Amino acid sequence: MEIQLINIGFGNIVSGNRVVAIVSPESAPIKRIISDAKERSQLIDATYGRRTRAVIIMDSNQVILSAIQPETVANRFVVDKDFKENAKK
């Protein structure tokens, strides 16, 4: 299993193999997840002071805030995966 890295904006990169979900921060349950992660010291703010547009939930229960749209992060995830599969052929 090879490591897949995803750019989440402003030079920040996460391991794609450990991502559980990429969601919008608008709903009350997601806001609760963010506040719970902050209390547990498991919140990583990668927004550089900008508005949070995507919340990335990792398999280690860490929550990462990103200033990039969830669709954009997901597309980077899929495009990178497709690129690597085509490179193997």
Curated annotation (Swiss-Prot):
It holds the Pfam family RemA-like. InterPro entries: RemA-like (IPR007169). Belongs to the RemA family. This is Putative regulatory protein ssl2874.
